[in-house]
């Protein structure tokens, strides 16, 4: 959900920021240098789509996190489902935070591959963001079929007496406040330290829980230390340490009505019938009185017409809370050997995430349905690469990459509603009374296995270890046939060794006795399926030709790969549903990059086409047969989702432009479209309560989109500056973005309407750029979008 923002920013600078366009009489666009190819290169010379957003652009348009990047870059969508989970859509493919499989999009901070939740933390003191669209099967650390996001933070500057510190403060509606600061400390001529930090607080979308009186709130704190040491012109050593913590309370808003008749009406009618039969002697005395204990949820505080998503109202008993803490250590060594350049990268990242939710979003259960997921992740990466610098004819990069990822997740639920709903005055669940959270209850049960034997509770405690070790060798060669024509090819050989397990522990209680499995630990993944070893080969081939020194035409082909895997299901389902095979893709991109009008106009355009074999899709809320010790059980809804493999095709267009109108005005924008569909004969899983089979409900998805990505999106920006008669200069910035209407992936009958966002920033800065004050309004039309639907 988006909302109107009315914000005031005061920025104190002690250095002149960099701008992405020239601000002098020459009226030319500045060269944009990126490292998408693992070396510094003009983005106009790269034979693939790369959208670069400079740090000054992020500051100028008040872009604070990835979810706002789509305002200046089309063809990408960034959505925070909740503070623990986030999705990214690029070229029609979607990163799923709950997938457990290789993702089509990978995020990086300073070349360190991270989980989506870490990449989605608020950006600050950022040098630039590079959005690499298309398959990344050669040079990037992790193979990703749809693209990659590279975030580069500012490093300490060595040997410069320039002061580049700043303090920024911001206040906004919805109780939003932000303080950001950074500065270099020059210790010696060869050693500098940069310190940066951010503190942010807000009430988000101001969702309110009318049952618990708890309102939405978010707090984010982060600090970063960057050390740069350059003992000689040949050697550069950088070390960065970042620590961040997010703490959020986020009630989940609902939409809808009670329906006709309501649950309360049905139950009251049933009780009155029992009372009537009791009066006639056909039912035992006291039958109606016993049923009076049955919980009947009432919604007297909800309007007769029901609730809309824009009302921002939550109804659940438990208060959802998310906490995420992360640490990143990153060592970067670069050595210029004359004919070659050596780069070494070592990183270690740790993440602890806790998510407490109430799965009873509608507030139908008197004590709710609490679930707690805790995930601890540790990732170590090593990368070594060497590039030649002594030949204008043949350029190459050869390297080794290693990534060791260890993840441990617990997913704990209190399912005592089976008895508390019948007699809430007599029975209470574990969570909210004896224990604060499901994880605390499960830990207590493991520590003292028989301590809950007399309690009328039902707890399920899941442990999911997931380890992966990736080792890869890669090489990329560029051969300049002439001054105008080049060919480029690369390959990557990788091996992925994995381990996964899923163990369900059922604490012994009065309702879950030893005879029904209480006290047991049940492995959900067979021992033969716990270990995996996968090899893959991916690569690229590119041809580029310069029509002149300002226009490049190119054709690129690149392959992608996603490993086979096993569905991690919260319930026991038919084993035949669990496995999915590897995905292989071939992407072709045909593009043009050009600079015109003596450097005042830049236009880049590309057409892309994917052919994907065994595309991995996860289907949520699937109706499937549950299996118990006794055999097939009831048909239930699988919340975690089940994977399928189907062939698919994706194609589309990316266009971006920038134009210097005059010395005071610059404008630009981008447009993207994508068309994706499953091949003929494709089968997906479905939510069908009428299903009576022994596996899972299915549906024909032939010709339907592979995700709920918008088919078209565009944005436009304009920056106008004029001298202020009282000194300094005034500026006005306009930013408009639009995203097409789309169909919900959960319910094909639900349409997510087109989203139109308009932002305006006005400000005044001093002539020497020492200070800057601005006022801005985001979403000035107060347009509202459903960014995520959970069914």
Residue ranges and their predicted role:
Residues 27-158, 590:
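Acidic, small-polar-rich N-terminal luminal/periplasmic segments of exported/outer-membrane proteins
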Residues 103-104, 124-127, 133, 138-223, ...:
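Outer-membrane beta-barrel translocator/receptor signature
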Residues 207-214, 251-314, 358-371, 412-463, ...:
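Solvent-exposed loop segments that connect transmembrane elements
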Residues 212, 218-397, 403-405, 602-604:
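Outer-membrane beta-barrel domain signature, strongest for Gram-negative TonB-dependent receptors
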Residues 228-232, 386-389, 395-403, 464-612, ...:
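Structural signature of Gram-negative outer-membrane beta-barrels, strongest in the C-terminal barrel
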Residues 332-337, 341-347, 352-357, 546-562, ...:
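Membrane-embedded beta-barrel scaffold of Gram-negative outer-membrane proteins
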Residues 389, 395-396, 480-487, 606-611, ...:
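Gram-negative outer-membrane beta-barrel transporters
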Residues 618, 667, 735-745, 764-791:
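C-terminal beta-signal and adjacent terminal beta-strands/loops
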């Amino acid at each position: 959900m988006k909302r109107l923002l009315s914000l005031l920013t005061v920025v104190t600078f002690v250095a002149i920021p960099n701008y992405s366009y020239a601000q002098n009489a020459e009226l030319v666009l500045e060269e944009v240098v990126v490292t998408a190819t693992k070396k510094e290169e003009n983005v106009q010379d790269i034979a693939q789509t790369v959208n670069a957003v400079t740090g000054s652009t992020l500051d100028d348009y008040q872009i604070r996190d990835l979810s706002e990047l789509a305002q200046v870059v089309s063809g990408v969508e960034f959505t925070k489902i909740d503070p623990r989970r986030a999705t990214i859509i690029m070229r029609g493919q979607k990163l799923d935070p709950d997938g457990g499989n290789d993702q089509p999009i990978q995020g990086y901070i300073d070349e360190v591959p991270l989980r989506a939740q870490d990449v989605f933390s608020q950006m600050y003191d950022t040098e630039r963001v590079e959005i690499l669209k298309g398959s990344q099967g050669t040079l990037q650390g992790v193979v990703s079929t749809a693209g990659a996001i590279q975030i580069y933070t500012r490093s300490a500057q060595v040997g410069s007496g320039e002061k580049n510190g700043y303090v920024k403060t911001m206040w906004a509606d919805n109780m939003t406040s932000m303080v950001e600061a950074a500065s270099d400390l020059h210790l010696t001529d060869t050693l500098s330290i940069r310190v940066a930090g951010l503190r942010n607080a807000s009430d988000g979308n101001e969702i309110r829980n009318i049952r618990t009186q708890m309102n939405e709130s978010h707090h984010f704190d982060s600090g970063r230390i960057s050390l740069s040491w350059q003992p000689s012109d040949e050697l550069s050593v950088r070390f960065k340490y970042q620590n961040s913590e997010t703490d959020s309370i986020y009630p989940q808003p609902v939409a809808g009505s009670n329906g006709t008749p309501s649950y309360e009406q049905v139950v009251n009618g049933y009780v009155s019938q029992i009372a009537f039969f009791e009066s006639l002697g056909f039912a035992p005395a006291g039958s109606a009185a016993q049923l009076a204990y049955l919980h009947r949820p009432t919604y007297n505080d909800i309007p007769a017409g029901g609730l809309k998503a824009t009302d921002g109202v939550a109804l659940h008993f438990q208060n959802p809370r998310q906490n995420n803490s992360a640490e990143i250590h990153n060592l970067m060594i670069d050595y210029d050997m004359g004919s070659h350049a050596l780069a070494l990268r070592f990183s270690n990242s740790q993440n602890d995430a806790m998510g407490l939710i109430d799965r009873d979003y509608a507030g139908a259960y008197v004590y709710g349905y609490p679930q707690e997921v805790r995930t601890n992740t540790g990732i170590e990466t090593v990368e070594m690469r060497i590039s030649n610098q002594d030949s204008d004819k043949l350029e190459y990069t050869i390297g080794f990459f290693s990534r060791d990822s260890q993840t441990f997740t617990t997913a704990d639920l209190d399912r005592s509603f089976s008895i508390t709903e019948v007699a809430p005055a007599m029975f209470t669940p574990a969570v909210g009374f004896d224990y604060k959270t499901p994880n605390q209850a499960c830990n207590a049960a493991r520590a003292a296995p028989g301590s809950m034997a007399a309690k009328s509770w039902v707890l399920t405690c899941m442990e999911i270890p997931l380890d992966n070790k990736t080792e890869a060798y890669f090489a990329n060669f560029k051969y300049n046939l002439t001054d105008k024509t080049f060919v480029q090819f690369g390959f990557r050989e990788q091996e992925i060794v994995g381990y996964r397990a899923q163990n369900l522990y059922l604490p012994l209680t009065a309702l879950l006795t030893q005879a029904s499995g209480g006290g047991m630990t049940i492995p959900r993944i067979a021992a033969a399926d716990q270990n995996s070893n996968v090899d893959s080969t991916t690569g690229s081939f590119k041809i580029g030709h310069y029509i002149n020194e300002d226009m490049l035409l190119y054709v690129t082909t690149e392959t992608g790969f996603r490993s086979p895997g096993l569905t991690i299901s919260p319930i026991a389902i038919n084993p035949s549903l669990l496995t999915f095979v590897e995905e292989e893709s071939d992407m072709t991109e045909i593009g043009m990059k050009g600079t015109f009008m003596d450097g005042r106009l830049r236009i880049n355009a590309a057409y892309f086409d994917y052919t994907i074999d065994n595309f991995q899709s996860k289907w949520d809320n699937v109706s499937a047969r549950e299996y118990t010790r006794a055999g097939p059980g009831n048909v239930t809804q699988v919340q975690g989702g089940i994977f399928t493999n189907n062939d698919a095709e994706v194609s589309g267009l990316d266009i971006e432009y920038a134009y210097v109108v005059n010395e005071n005005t610059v404008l630009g924008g981008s447009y993207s479209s994508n068309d994706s569909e499953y091949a003929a004969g494709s089968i997906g899983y479905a939510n069908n309560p009428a299903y009576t089979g022994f596996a899972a409900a299915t549906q024909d998805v032939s010709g339907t989109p592979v995700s709920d990505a918008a088919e078209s999106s565009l944005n436009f920006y304009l920056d106008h500056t004029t001298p202020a008669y009282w000194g300094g200069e005034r500026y006005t910035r306009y930013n408009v973005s639009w995203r097409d209407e789309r169909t919900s992936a959960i319910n094909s009958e639900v349409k997510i309407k087109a989203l139109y966002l308009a932002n305006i920033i006005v400000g005044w800065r001093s002539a020497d750029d020492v200070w800057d004050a601005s006022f801005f309004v985001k979403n000035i039309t107060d347009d509202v979008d459903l960014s995520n639907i959970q069914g």
